[in-house]
């Protein structure tokens, strides 16, 4: 039997699989774990009372996180003319139209977010099979197809969580990094859940926010008490 590492021992000692933790307790556990050679993200999984097979119960959107994600995102923008100039001024890393499309087709995807002006969708639409599977396809529902590309770039750079419920009815997204304070994570969680509550489908019945789990990239999943987050604060 292999020997447990210090990290594994701490997880076994501090995380009980059947217990519901407060956010403060969960963040404390993640921050106390022995550090790895890279900066871990803090991720959240939210089980919703929806049926994603029904088109009117697909919950998706984007939330500007007050404390950011701790990661600087590379942003590509499909735009031309004044919109392209505005995107560059806002800090976009790559801006273009057909030339940018050729880069994408060649496999040059060195960016985390793709934004498009409405008149650029004729070009972007041809890239669906490349961008779609990577979660990079611009969509107006999450604010990445917009006439105000500068604002979208600023939001992405400042720290924005985009999300879409998966086939199991769960939303997964990043809300910070290990090392964030409890207050920073709390601000981000509250902002995210406020948006998710507002996006509750009218046809969703019963408990909407069923389960919340906090984790780090290589850390344990810690179940939070969902009750405090089911109503607006």
UniProtKB/Swiss-Prot annotation:
Provide the family line: Belongs to the universal ribosomal protein uL1 family.
Taxonomically, the superkingdom here is: Bacteria
Signal sequence annotation: none
Biological process per Gene Ontology, one example term: translation
Q: Which GO terms describe its cellular component?
A: cytosolic large ribosomal subunit
The scientific name of the source species is: Psychrobacter sp. (strain PRwf-1)
InterPro entries documented for this protein: Ribosom_uL1_bac-type (IPR005878), Ribosomal_uL1 (IPR002143), Ribosomal_uL1-like (IPR023674), Ribosomal_uL1/biogenesis (IPR028364), Ribosomal_uL1_3-a/b-sand (IPR016095), Ribosomal_uL1_CS (IPR023673)
Task: Show the PANTHER family listed in the entry.
Answer: 54S RIBOSOMAL PROTEIN L1, MITOCHONDRIAL, LARGE RIBOSOMAL SUBUNIT PROTEIN UL1M
- Listed CDD domains: Ribosomal_L1
Keywords assigned by UniProt, alphabetized: Repressor, Ribonucleoprotein, Ribosomal protein, RNA-binding, rRNA-binding, Translation regulation, tRNA-binding
One GO MF term attached to the UniProt entry: tRNA binding
Q: What is this protein called?
A: Large ribosomal subunit protein uL1
Q: Which Pfam families match?
A: Ribosomal_L1
Record's function text: Binds directly to 23S rRNA. The L1 stalk is quite mobile in the ribosome, and is involved in E site tRNA release. Protein L1 is also a translational repressor protein, it controls the translation of the L11 operon by binding to its mRNA.
How does this chain assemble?
A: Part of the 50S ribosomal subunit.
């Amino acid at each position: 039997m292999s020997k447990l590492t210090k990290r594994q021992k701490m997880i076994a000692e501090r995380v009980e699989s059947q217990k519901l933790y407060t956010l403060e307790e969960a963040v404390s556990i993640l921050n106390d774990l022995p550090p790895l050679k890279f900066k871990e993200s803090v991720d959240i999984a939210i089980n919703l009372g929806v049926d994603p097979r029904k088109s009117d119960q697909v919950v998706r959107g984007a939330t500007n996180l007050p404390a950011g994600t701790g990661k600087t995102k590379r942003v590509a923008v499909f735009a031309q003319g004044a919109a392209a100039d505005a995107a560059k001024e806002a800090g976009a890393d790559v801006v273009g139209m057909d030339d940018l499309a050729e880069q994408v087709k060649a496999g040059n995807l060195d960016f985390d977010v793709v934004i498009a002006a409405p008149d650029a969708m004729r070009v972007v639409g041809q890239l669906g099979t490349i961008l779609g599977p990577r979660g990079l396809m611009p969509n107006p529902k999450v604010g990445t197809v917009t006439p105000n590309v500068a604002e979208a770039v600023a939001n992405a750079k400042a720290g924005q969580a985009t999300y879409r419920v998966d086939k199991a009815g769960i939303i997964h997204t990043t809300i910070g990094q290990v090392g964030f304070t409890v207050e920073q994570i709390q601000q981000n969680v509250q902002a995210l859940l406020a948006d998710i509550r507002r996006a509750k489908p009218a046809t969703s019945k019963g408990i909407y926010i069923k389960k919340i789990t906090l984790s780090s990239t290589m850390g344990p999943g810690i179940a939070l008490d969902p009750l405090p987050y089911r109503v607006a604060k």
